[in-house]
Each structure stands twice: as C-alpha cells, then as structure tokens.
From Swiss-Prot:
Pfam families the record matches: Sod_Cu
High-level lineage: Eukaryota, Viridiplantae, Streptophyta, Embryophyta, Tracheophyta
Subunit structure: Homodimer.
Protein name (record): Superoxide dismutase [Cu-Zn] 2
Top EC class of this enzyme: oxidoreductase
Length: 152
C-alpha cells in the first residue's frame, strides 16, 4: 500500500488535508477534509507541477500526460488530473472520497510531487461552452493548493 498526503494552504483562510492511498495496481483513493470555503461546488484537480513559489499560480496546468481535452472524471476524454467538483456545505467544510484510476502513486505517471488545487468556482466538466471549458473547466481562480508527498 502506497500512501501520500497534501496539506492545503491558502492566503484566503482555506485549509485542509488530502490523503491518497493506492494498493498495487488498484485505483487511487482520495480522502479529503477542507474548511474555509464558500458553500457550493468547487473544481478539484491535480496540477502538473509541485511548485508553490508563486502560491497556487505556479502549479502549472492540470496534470495531462495523455494530451487530452478537459472533461469529467467519468469521461474517457479528460486530463488525468480532472477530479471534478467537491461539494462544500453551509458550514464551509467539505469531506469527500474520490476513487480514480488515472492518478497513480507509483510508476512513470505518478502524481507524487505534483500539486492538488481547489478552485473558486464549479468545474463545468468541459461541457459549459465557455472558451475555458475544454482546458480548465472554467473553474475560476486557484484558492488553495498543496504538494502531494509520499507518506510513511
């Protein structure tokens, strides 16, 4: 069993912990607890770079090793890092579990060392018709992020 963690920080008062686990070649399970967000849907993605020197802006684009267009987690055509939306309750917190086969913790396409990002707005899953739908899901600004690191 491989385990990883990302601790989310932001200048906007958002904080949280995202745990990743993968058993062999099985899909990766993502368990998250985040607080300080506005209620509603927020885009949630793995971004290509584990660089936070300029805050969440330096994490690069969505992780996309296959060079595909943006989509929903269940779509065949999607970025590997497209994990859809998280739902934030009226109290500003989100607790969620995602299982995904395109974000391995080992091998050449591992997400270790990359970043996880929470966006300000809902991800339209590539179906919104906006000019940014097919690249970012038109999910708005990056309000919290953390680097995915191996856990002992």
């Amino acid at each position: 069993m491989v385990k990883a963690v990302a601790v989310l920080n932001s200048s906007e008062g958002v904080s949280g912990t995202i745990l990743f686990t993968q058993d062999g070649a099985a899909p990766t399970t993502v368990n998250g607890n985040i607080s300080g967000l506005k209620p509603g849907l927020h885009g949630f993605h793995v971004h290509a770079l584990g660089d936070t020197t300029n805050g969440c802006m330096s994490t690069g684009p969505h992780y996309n090793p296959a060079g595909k267009e943006h989509g929903a987690p269940e779509d065949e055509v999607r970025h590997a890092g497209d994990l859809g939306n998280i739902t934030v309750g009226e109290d500003g917190t989100a607790s969620f579990t995602i299982t995904d086969k395109q974000i391995p913790l080992t091998g050449p396409q591992s997400i270790i060392g990359r970043a996880v990002v929470v966006h300000a707005d809902p991800d339209d899953l590539g179906k919104g018709g906006h000019e940014l739908s097919k690249s970012t899901g038109n999910a708005g600004g990056r309000i919290a992020c953390g680097i995915i690191g191996l856990q002992g």
